[in-house]
Amino acid sequence: MNLGFGILIFVLGLVIGLVIGFFVARNSMKSYLAKNPPISEEMMKSMMMSMGQKPSQKKLNQMMAQMKQQSEQSQKK
């Protein structure tokens, strides 16, 4: 009886730790991606230049705002 209770406590602690760890990791990853987006203005600028477009600051700002809006919408879901 004592051994079974110890195993039960161990398994419950492991499951609770995994659930808490998952949510902490997810929250920290979301905040990291919000602070450091995976693509920057410089990367967009070079991408547009390689496609043969002349990147203006207005276009870059529009694209960055559009990406930010899409990421906010996906976080709400």
Curated annotation (Swiss-Prot):
Q: Where is this region: Disordered?
A: 50-77
Supply the InterPro entries for this chain.
UPF0154
Q: Primary place of residence?
A: membrane
Q: Does the keyword Cytoplasm apply?
A: no
Membrane topology according to the record: Single-pass membrane protein
Cellular compartments annotated: Cell membrane
Q: Which domain of life is it from?
A: Bacteria
Q: Which keywords does UniProt give here?
A: Cell membrane, Membrane, Transmembrane, Transmembrane helix
Membrane-crossing segments per the record: 5-25
Where does it sit, as one GO cellular component term? plasma membrane
Q: Which family does it belong to?
A: Belongs to the UPF0154 family.
* Protein known as: UPF0154 protein LCK_00994
Which source organism? Answer: Leuconostoc citreum (strain KM20)
Lineage start: Bacteria, Bacillati, Bacillota, Bacilli, Lactobacillales
